[in-house]
């Protein structure tokens, strides 16, 4: 399998052909300020994220059209939007800051694509389109067949000879014409249960592959939808659930 350093800057290598958002890598507050300006802020909205992180930690959105007043009265306290001034103040609290990425903001449709592959050859591929996304969590989605999205991911899988279970995150630009790869996660993704609901149980199939068992030919049930809802549960003083 080709060695891919964790700090490899793929867009600097035109041979890979991978379409990614325009971005800058920064290590200091001053470099971040320069990157924000170079990428078009305040005319353009931007995303600022830690190069190493998970679960939406270290990610904020810069949008000059959203005021602090609007954030206070119209956004929940866990909003991902932040003002430029607050971002600079926050990052200036320490003498050093971790590597960060300043990138163009992609407001279009979000896709997650899950794979089970055999050393670069895809065995199963399931793509999920986000219908309602809140702080990077798909609250509702549909399993659909998007050839453009799957083709981009498949090229990466074959180029890097990826193996086992893993997943991609992609975002479209504002007019939903162009998909961009945002992340490649070398693990089972949090939304893989939706693939199982659509008839392709990737964790189970991954175990069968490792055990050398034959794998069935499967096609996802396109159109399968997931809607995440929260429901209160009530218990008595002894901890027994109340059904009423």
Model-predicted regions and their roles:
Residues 131-136, 142-244:
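ATP-dependent carboxylate activation and anion-phosphoryl transfer catalytic cores
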Residues 26-29, 110, 147, 200:
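Electropositive phosphate-/nucleotide-binding environments in soluble metabolic enzymes
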Residues 43-44, 98, 109-111, 164-166:
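Short beta-strand or tight-loop elements
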Residues 3-99:
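Active-site nucleotide/adenylate-binding loops and adjacent lid/helix of ATP-dependent enzymes
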Residues 40, 52-53, 105-109, 161-164:
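A short catalytic or substrate-binding loop motif that flags glycine-/basic-rich loops and adjacent residues
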Residues 27, 104, 166:
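Short loop/edge segments at beta-strand edges and connector loops
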Residues 61-63, 117, 197-199:
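Short, glycine/charged-enriched secondary-structure capping and boundary segments
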Residues 57, 72-154, 172, 179-180:
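Phosphate-binding site of ATP-dependent enzymes
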